[in-house]
Amino acid sequence: MGSGNWIIDNLNSALEMWNGRLEEIWQLITTSPENFKGGGIWNVIVGINGGLKAVGYALLVLFFVMGIVKTCGSFAEMKKPELAFKCFIRFVLAQAAVTWGMELMTGAFRVAQSMVTTIIDSSGLTAMSATALPDEMASIIEDVGFIDSIPLWAVTLLGSLFIWVLSLVMILTVYSRFFKLYIATASAPVPLASFAGQPSSSIGVAFLKSYAAICLEGCVIVLACVIFSAFASSPPAIADDTLAAATIVWNYVGELIFNMLVLVGAIKMSDRIIRELMGLG
């Protein structure tokens, strides 16, 4: 229900949009790919992964032959038992990776999700702290006359626009993590087949590093949300209530947007942060 003041209602609408996106992120980050959007997308991804296994098996032979040709200088070296055994073990392990790749990847994601759950439980948060307009700020805005309220319209419009844009950027980044998970899972048999040959194994290593980074992005996102929740629990204070109303509101909106920018920046760079911290670049 509106307050009857357009400026207050505009700010509250923007903050409700922000709080709604935070709640959505909190739910998404604890959701597994199998349950995302009812699991329909996951069923399609599983089917694609199964279809690409045939391609993976064909590439197994190709990468295996390429590896033997590049690592063996002559036909005589291929007859060495230790070399033949090493190549055989590599081929068997690569075949197992292609065959059981889905199970391995879902297992890795569950490990990352358990880390996310541990972070949430350790923080003591069950939900994100809502950001609300302080009562004293609402009182200052309500006491402003019509002429003096004109600058406030511009300030609140600009601030609300920033909050809406930041909300959309933040939620799109979290959604993109799911799409990266789906793309990596669907195409997994192809890069995993590269482990059959030693020269091509770098492709598989790079793929596993990228997948690990995608899974661990959730930890960075949760940590960023926990830190922001601490900021939101103590909203920006009104330093000097003798200033003009437009200046007070501008200072409040500016500090609020800065805190939001910190959260959005951390979420947006979660992939880069985890790669730098874990050496997965």
What kind of region is each of these model predictions?
Residues 192-209, 273-277:
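Alpha-helical transmembrane segments
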Residues 95-187, 221, 225-278:
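Non-cytosolic segments of integral membrane proteins
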Residues 48-55, 91, 95, 172, ...:
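Loop-to-transmembrane-helix entry motif
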Residues 1-10, 81-101, 204-215, 270:
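Alpha-helical transmembrane segments and their helix-start/interface "positive-inside/aromatic belt" motifs
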Residues 59-95, 187-201:
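Hydrophobic transmembrane alpha-helix segments characteristic of membrane transport
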Residues 54-66, 158, 162-163, 181:
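Hydrophobic alpha-helical transmembrane segments
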Residues 45-53, 85-89, 93, 142-145, ...:
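Alpha-helical membrane-interface segments at transmembrane helix boundaries
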Residues 1-59:
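Binding/recognition "hotspot" determinant
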